[in-house]
């Protein structure tokens, strides 16, 4: 065990984490030259294209250090994005060390800080690495200063490296061996293994990536998963060098994979503890929590005949993504579809993109909403994921909305516009500090304001320089109301929205006027109204198309004209009673694009 080192890499998007991982694998001879593809550990196409890492992956590398000892280095790759922060904390708790990769030309960014604090809380040894030293604009001194100011760790021994040219790779490996402590653990104690990640393989079922904390695991052992109380027979174990290689056993301190013929990903939850069914551990490893979706949206197939196909696609995605939740939902306007829960906006985009790309689905997504807690007058508390499920106003005692703490980093010239944006989004400023040329702002903002378009707006007011990170704080009472949309007096459930009372009238007017341009003219007048309860707060009319019935009367008597006009009017009235209005799909998207003032 003295020769094992478990470490992971922490970095903001695009600071060169995956490239560095490739270099380390290459240097330790994990893959032959011909098998090296860029970003070996990012296995999904979408991970490579967006340049982000979604699932954790591992590589066990054999490294012969300068004094001749062979060390077994386990690299655990972590996702860097805020939506996947739980996966990050699980990956980090399986390590004793972490490389903090900072782009020497850009300095520290928000997500790096968030993940770095997670690492420090878990007691992981953090080694700073200044990457991209081959760039002409690299400024190692400023970056070093920022690491010390913002994160507060000593960066005087930071390794200067460039993953692209391969400079500094040996120094990184040596500092891992020298500064990362070996794992603690007792091979003779009852088995405790942490599930770092799990995914579904078409041939063998669920593959679990585990870190053995205590004990030894061998094939043919009966294992027990402590959170889901499921027992399975362990079929195959091994390590990834990124290719999988079977092993006769995994003992304390090692990282590897376990295949136990599990059919459902629900059983192998990330963060759960594996132990032996015959000789179980006294208690599970700390830190496990159920991941709860924060953002909900409806997904509907464009062709209603593709409903079953959408369900199959979602089930297949769920095999690889335990955080995705979905349940069937029927909307009068959009037909049959699903209400899906996501960890955050990026997660939602990725699910949509994977549905379109891997399963060839055409889908409509309704406006994303967050989960509200509603306390009713009889004292019961219900959670509302969709505006159409909001109880009647008379029954509601209090509505609580989720509040998140947002950490923002940006160059000082953009502080003004960013603060204005946060205030418009009902933000409350908690803190502001300057570190060199970077400014660090902390705000509390309702999650509902963030899911709409906060991220896009932030990027546009700061010309792309600001970076953000958010974490859930609590539910707080809020003055929010449900705004219904009525078309010819009929409520359209899919168009209902929940808005803050101060903002409701403005948003209602915007949506209604936008809908007016999208609903085609009919043979009769169409009234589009927005209402809070019974009070109508905005209205637009779509004028009827009419034929000029007087065209054939030359001169003629006024009573003759009147008769024709009355006849037309009666016809229109009759039509309005039986006619129904087709709502085009663009109208549903209109709600998504309404700006808050």
Swiss-Prot record:
UniProt xrefs under SMART domains: EFG_C (SM00838)
Binding site for GTP: 14-19, 131-134
Keywords: Cell inner membrane, Cell membrane, GTP-binding, Hydrolase, Membrane, Nucleotide-binding, Protein biosynthesis
Pfam families assigned: EFG_C, GTP_EFTU, GTP_EFTU_D2, LepA_C
Taxonomic superkingdom: Bacteria
Catalytic reaction annotation: GTP + H2O = GDP + phosphate + H(+)
Entry's EC annotation: 3.6.5.n1
Main location: membrane
Enzyme class: hydrolase
Disulphide linkage map: none
GO BP terms in the entry: positive regulation of translation
GO molecular function: GTP binding; GTPase activity; guanosine tetraphosphate binding; ribosome binding; translation elongation factor activity
Membrane topology reported for the UniProt record: Peripheral membrane protein
Compartments in which it is found: Cell inner membrane
HAMAP family: LepA
Protein name: Elongation factor 4
